[in-house]
Regions:
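Conserved short hydrophobic interaction patches
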Residues: 78-79, 130
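Hydrophobic positions on the alpha1 helix immediately C-terminal to the Walker A/P-loop
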Residues: 71, 75
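Conserved lysine of the Walker
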Residues: 68
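P-loop NTPase switch/communication element
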Residues: 53, 80-118, 122-125, 223-224
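P-loop NTPase motor-domain active sites and their immediate coupling elements
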Residues: 2-36, 41-43, 47-49, 54-55, ...
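The conserved Walker
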Residues: 63-65, 212
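Short hydrophobic/aromatic beta-strand immediately N-terminal to the Walker A/P-loop
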Residues: 58-59
Length: 394
């Protein structure tokens, strides 16, 4: 305690904080960290950094234009500058398609930047499979986490330098730039994947950064909040939004333009930081440098559905696999071809189904090319004609 009282007054002119300035000042500390990221400067003018491996997952939220995307870019560039491609791999999910797509070609990426929300859901499910695979490897080597595994592999490499089958395990950082878009497309699958990654993936060296500009409870659900202990709040419109992010007020009083409250895991009081800024020109120079040093080699299977991910995505909460066709599926296909049009409400009336079941069947018909895409409130057009159906049966 002190015998004085301090009152925070914002400066008339905001002084920008450059990423380069923070990295140069904290270079030694960052080199000793597993996953160092640059945050900015606190109210005393001290440069602030964080280690994602200790975070271990991070929620970034704030209203439009408050500085979220700049913060995400500074995190990515901190990792590109301080770590080699074999030390850390990035999975970037960018539903907005313009914010992170310029990182394509960087060797640190595990796969090309994911812009399709449906592919993003599949990518998250494949990350869960990678986590399970890593735990199997840990069990085989009798180690508890990625640090123990890499130490054991390093010792084996020193003993057998000619053995090319021994490799160190790289960290994986998954960055989602806009969670709200993913929750609209596949909220159940995305929420399940986030829950599994945040609960178990830390020891496997997989870390998650989730950003959203809609800090409402339908996006930042209880499951997401409970499993992501570290938070960054930028300026928001109301105290309710601040409570959704930080479980306390304060973010509604921030100034915007990178002014943030950082609440790391285990801390009760958030730290006020002026977030660092990185220009588009600097980002391009970092990308050009890293791309020149090494050719990118991507794993395209991350965004592709396989048998394992299909079983994850189609299993319900109670473990029931909904990948099997509905018992009425063939009858509904015949009905659709006869009538030439189909809708969820039509199936409800004709087959006496509940709305959820009818909507699932309509989605399945579209997925298999039986009916066309949604056209406002009109019934869906059937793409398979009667004579074609008869030919296939013959």
């Amino acid at each position: 305690g002190k015998t004085t009282v301090g009152v925070e007054i914002p400066n008339k002119i905001t002084v920008g904080v450059q990423v380069r300035e923070v990295i140069q000042d904290k270079q030694k500390e960052m080199m000793s960290m597993k996953l160092p990221v640059s945050l900015g400067k606190d109210i005393n003018g001290n440069n602030c950094i964080a280690d994602l491996s200790k975070t271990p997952h991070l929620l970034v939220a704030g209203s439009t234009g408050s500085g979220k995307s700049v913060c995400i870019n500074s995190f990515i560039n901190s990792l590109l500058i301080t770590k080699r491609p074999d030390e850390v791999k990035l999975v970037l999910v960018d539903p907005k398609k313009v914010e992170l797509s310029n990182y394509n070609g960087v060797p640190h990426l595990l796969c090309p930047v994911v812009t399709d929300p449906k592919k993003a859901s599949i990518a998250l499910q494949n990350i869960v499979k990678e986590m399970e695979k890593r735990y199997d490897m840990f069990a085989d080597e009798k180690v508890k986490n990625i640090v123990g595994y890499n130490e054991k592999m390093s010792a084996m490499m020193k003993k057998n330098p000619e053995d090319k089958t021994i490799h160190l395990m790289s960290y994986i950082v998954v960055i989602i730039d806009e969670l709200a878009d993913l929750m609209l497309v596949a909220s159940k699958e995305v929420e399940d994947s986030i829950m599994r990654i945040t609960q178990m993936a830390r020891a496997a060296g997989i870390h998650l950064i989730v950003a959203t500009q809609r800090p409402s409870t339908d996006v930042i659900t209880g499951v997401v909040k409970a499993n992501i202990p570290s938070r960054i709040a930028f300026a928001v419109a109301s105290q309710i939004d601040s409570r959704t992010i930080l479980d306390m007020g304060g973010a509604e009083k921030l100034l915007g333009k990178g002014d943030m409250l950082y609440k790391p895991m285990g801390e009760n009081t958030p730290l006020r930081i002026q977030g660092n800024f990185i220009s588009d020109d600097e980002i391009e120079r970092v990308i050009a440098y890293t791309s020149k040093e090494q050719v990118a080699s991507y794993d395209e299977s991350i965004t592709q559905m396989n048998q394992n991910t299909e079983s994850i995505s189609t299993a319900g909460v109670g473990g029931r696999d909904t990948s099997e066709d509905d018992p009425l599926y063939n009858e509904i296909v015949d009905f659709a071809i006869e009538t030439g049009k189909v809708s969820a409400s039509l199936l409800q009336r004709r087959f006496r189904l509940g709305y959820n079941r009818a909507a699932r069947i309509v989605d399945l018909l579209e997925e298999r090319g039986v009916i066309g895409p949604q056209n406002g409130s009109k019934p869906r057009e059937v793409l398979i004609k009667m004579d074609k159906q008869e030919d296939t049966e013959e």
